[in-house]
């Protein structure tokens, strides 16, 4: 059997080969200067889409706010695998809230930052709240609708993975009808 070397080709901006490109051709993800809000070492499942989605979403929010961001995270899979006591994988100011009240906690943080900004104590610090589909559409919908009704200055991210993943993959109200979750 003969040996034939295979040439490596760049297949996208997020592949390992990105570091082999000239610096001006590299993507943001290959740049050492980029924000990394969620570090490696968390306990998410291998290939976890929520970990990757959270990292990209929060990194984008960090970029948009010049790294002036505070996050409120509802109890759920993301919180469980990223912050086992006493450790955390988050590299931003981050607070854990109850299962359905991340929007309420974020509203309080945003109100406090507004007062501190008016007093000249802080700059333009923005607030992000995040939770899974169960904590958002089932348990936390009252807090979320109140936040939207008041037009609070909070970015809310719902990670809809089709069910309550850290408690046995039960369906949530965001799970499509007749979908199999387990």
Question: What residues fall within each predicted segment?
Answer:
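Cofactor-binding active-site loop characterized by glycine-rich and histidine/acidic residues
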Residues: 5-159, 163-180
